[in-house]
Amino acid sequence: MLEPVFVDTGYVLALVNEHEQHHAQAVLLAQRYDRHPVVATDAVLLEIGNALSRLARPAAAQIMADFRESVGSTVVHLTPELFDAAFARYQGHADKTWGLVDCVSFVVMRRMGFRTLLAFDQHFVQAGFVLARP
């Protein structure tokens, strides 16, 4: 079985939007990691839904349904304990511009042992993770 890969919002947005600056790289990453199981949080799915609600609502709905229904994907749900851990990280790094959803991802990735992810956000690098390369 292939190693699971964590998915960030920015990767999905770049994959869907051909005008996004990272689109070509996202397509290459999608090809490379096509058969890998994927992991995201429901907070990431909320960001995807919000970001695509006006321009690509059907695509957003399909992406979220695929994440929720596919046997090859795992959605980690936001619990009160997970929120508290992410919020503590958010508060504890006032010198960073990390978003709260990114902090949720950081906590989940550390707990699940992820080092590499599908993303273009340098905040993950600041937090000690590695962005996947095509």
What are these regions (language model features)?
Residues 8, 102, 121:
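Acidic active-site catalytic centers that drive phospho-/nucleotidyl reactions
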Residues 37-39, 71-74:
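Short loop->beta-strand "edge-of-pocket" segments that line small-molecule binding or catalytic clefts
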Residues 2-4, 106, 111-134:
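Acidic, PIN/NYN-like endoribonuclease modules and their adjacent C-terminal/linker elements
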Residues 3, 74-115:
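Active-site neighborhoods of divalent-metal-dependent phosphate/nucleic-acid chemistry enzymes
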Residues 1-40, 53-64:
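Short, well-structured N-terminal submotif of metal-dependent ribonuclease cores
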Residues 12, 45, 124-125:
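A generic structural signal for short hydrophobic patches within well-formed alpha-helices
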